Amino acid sequence: MPASTLLQHAQIDWDDQGRPHSRQYGDVYFAINEGIAETQHVFLEQTRLRQRFANLAPHGCLVIGETGFGTGMNFFCAWQLFAETAHADARLHFVSVEKYPLGHADMARAMRLWPELAAFTEPFLRQYVAVHQGFQQFTFDQGRITLTLLIGDVLEQLPQLDARIDVWFLDGFAPAKNPDMWTPELFTQLARLSHAGTALGTFTTTGWVRRSLIEAGFTMKKVPGIGKKWEVMSGEYTGPPNAPMSAPWYARPTAPEGPREALVIGAGLAGSASAASLAARGWQVTVLERHDAAAREASGNPQGVLYLKLSAHGTALSQMILSGFGYTRRQLELLQRGQDWDACGVLQLAFDSKEAERQGRLADAFEGSLLRAVQRNEAEAIAGVGLPAGGLFYTEGGWVHPPALCKAQLQHPNIRLLAHHDVLALRKADGLWQAWAGDRLLASAPMVVLAGAADVKRFEPCAQLPLKRIRGQITRLPVTDASRALATVVCAEGYVAPPRGEEHTLGASFDFHSDDLTPTVAEHQGNLAMLDEISTDLARRLGTAALAPEQLQGRAAFRCTSPDYLPIVGPVADPAAFAEAYAVLAKDARQVPEVPCPWLEGLYVNSGHGSRGLITAPLSGELIAAWVSGEPLPLPRAVAEACHPNRFGLRRLIRGK
C-alpha cells in the first residue's frame, strides 16, 4: 500500500537563460547548452546503449530504469538513439521514478529548448495527461516504445516494481541536494532489479555512493566527464542472482514456445485491449468474436463513463483504478474528441450524508488535479443545469463511446478479427490451443487469451472462477435545445451524460436475477426516476414527463464482476494440479512450498471488469502482455497479484472450500 496518494507537482522557477530550477531541491534540471551532450555522454555512451540497441533481435526488448524523470531529457535521447539504431521490430521499455512530476505547461516549456527532439517530445506531450500517484504507463510509436512512470518517492515505488532492468540511468539531483534518495536502500533496489551485465551510468562520483554501489553488487569505475564535470561513473552489475520476488503461484510462467501467434476469444474491451498489447509486441493475433462485429455486448453502449470509484486508503483496487484511468485517458487522446469520447469531466453528487462523508475523505486524500470538492452553486455552474447538491468533480473524467475504443485497438496490422466465430471448447494438441465450435476447428495457436466476460467459465480451466453476471439497462433520450446545456457527466446512483450526437445516455440499472437482455419498460421507468434524483431541472429540459416509457430506446447487457471487484487478469493454472501442489496451505497458510506452479502453458484470462471496463480493461491488456513477454509489470507487484486468477484457488485451499 502506498504511503501517500497525495501528489505534489514540481515547483519550477525559470532563470534568465530559460533553464528550469527546482524549488524543492534548489538545483537546475540540466545545463542550458550542454544538457543533451551530457545525457549522451553519461547515460548513452557509458552504458554502450548504441551497441545494445543495434544488437537487439527482432521482437527483443531492452529495459532501461531511471531514477529521476525530471523533464524527460534522458528518455527522449534514448528514444532518439533507439529509433536510429534498433531493428524495426525491436522494442524499448523505459521505467522511470519521479517524486515531483512537472505540470504540463512547465514540461512543454522545457521541451521547447530542444527543437531537435521534437519528433519525440510532441507525441509525449500529447499524452502527458492524467499523471497521478503510482504506476503510469504510456505507449508510443504503435507500441514500439513503452514508458512506465512511477510517480512517488523512489523508496516507496521501486520496491513495488517487478522488472528485469538491462541499463540504469542513476540520475536525480546531486546527493548533496537530494540526500533522501541517495541511500543504501536505493542501491539495494537497483541490485534487486538487475541481472548479470546490467549497466549503470551516473553523474555523481561521490565516494560513499561509489562504495555503496560496489557493496550492492556493482563494479564501478570513474571515467572522464564532459564540460565542467571532470569525471562521471559507469558500472556493471556483477553481484549474485536475485531471488524471485513472489511465491510460486504468482511467479512468471515461461513464455510460450513456437510461433508468435495468439488467439483472443472475445472482442469487447478486454479482448480488444489484449489483442492490441500483444500485436504491439509482434504477435500475430486472431480475435474470435461470436457476434457480427466487435463490442456487441457490455462494451457496446453508446456512452460509458470514466468514473473513478476510489478509496482513501490506497487499496489494490484503488491503485488499479488510478493507473488504469491514466492509461485509458492517454489512449483516448488518439481518438476523435466529441464523437469517440469527451473530457467533459465527471461530477459525483453528494446525494446523502454518507456519500458526503466519503467524498470528504477522498478530497483530503487526493490532489486537486484529480478531484476536488465543489459546493452546489459551483456544481451547477460546471454542469450547466440545476442540481440538488454539490459533490466531487473529476476534472479529467468524461464519457467514451466504447465501440470506438475497441475498433481503434483492433486496427493494428497484426490483428485479424473473425466475426461469427463462437468458441464452445478449447483443446490442447501438439503444443497448440485449438478453438472448437462443435466438430469445427475455428483456429489454433500456442497462446490464447480468454476475454469473453462470464463466458470464460464455459472453458474447464476457468470453470471455478467466481464470476457473476449483473444485468444493466441504459436508456437513450433524444436531445432537446434545452438539454444541450448539460456540460459534464453527472452521477448519483446512476449517471447521465452530455449528448453524443442527438442523444443523451442515461443509466444504468442493476438486476442480479434476470438473464433476459430484452429492454424492459420498468427499467426505463427506473432510469427516468434516477434522472429525477440527479437533476429535476435536466428532466424538465428533456421533457421526460411527456415521454412514453414504452416508446423509449435502450439496450441491456451483462456486467461481469468478481467477489472482490478486482478484474481477473493473468496466466491460468491447472485447477486440479494446483490444488494438489499446494494442498499443504489447507493446514498452514504460511507455508510457501517450493513447487513450481502447474501452469497451463500459453493460457491467459482477462475478465471481471464489472462496470469499470473503460478504466481497467485497456491497462489489463498491457498486464497480459507483460506476463507473456517478461517485461516490467505495469502495476505494483501486489496489485498484479490481487488481480491474479490464482487468488481464488489459494482462498479455496486456505478456507477449506
Curated annotation (Swiss-Prot):
Residue ranges, annotated region (FAD-dependent cmnm(5)s(2)U34 oxidoreductase): 265-657
Catalytic activity: 5-aminomethyl-2-thiouridine(34) in tRNA + S-adenosyl-L-methionine = 5-methylaminomethyl-2-thiouridine(34) in tRNA + S-adenosyl-L-homocysteine + H(+)
Localization per Swiss-Prot or TrEMBL: Cytoplasm
Key words of the record: Cytoplasm, FAD, Flavoprotein, Methyltransferase, Multifunctional enzyme, Oxidoreductase, S-adenosyl-L-methionine, Transferase, tRNA processing
Essential cofactor(s): FAD
Region tRNA (mnm(5)s(2)U34)-methyltransferase, annotated ranges: 1-238
E.C. code: 2.1.1.61, 1.5.-.-
CC per GO annotation: cytoplasm
Coiled coil spans: none
Example GO molecular function: tRNA (5-methylaminomethyl-2-thiouridylate)(34)-methyltransferase activity
Annotated S-S bridges: none
GO biological process, one term: tRNA wobble uridine modification
Family as reported in the entry's similarity comment: In the N-terminal section; belongs to the methyltransferase superfamily. tRNA (mnm(5)s(2)U34)-methyltransferase family. In the C-terminal section; belongs to the DAO family.
Role according to the record: Catalyzes the last two steps in the biosynthesis of 5-methylaminomethyl-2-thiouridine (mnm(5)s(2)U) at the wobble position (U34) in tRNA. Catalyzes the FAD-dependent demodification of cmnm(5)s(2)U34 to nm(5)s(2)U34, followed by the transfer of a methyl group from S-adenosyl-L-methionine to nm(5)s(2)U34, to form mnm(5)s(2)U34.
Name by which UniProt lists this protein: tRNA 5-methylaminomethyl-2-thiouridine biosynthesis bifunctional protein MnmC
Taxonomic source organism: Pseudomonas putida (strain W619)
Lineage, uppermost ranks: Bacteria, Pseudomonadati, Pseudomonadota, Gammaproteobacteria, Pseudomonadales
Gene: mnmC
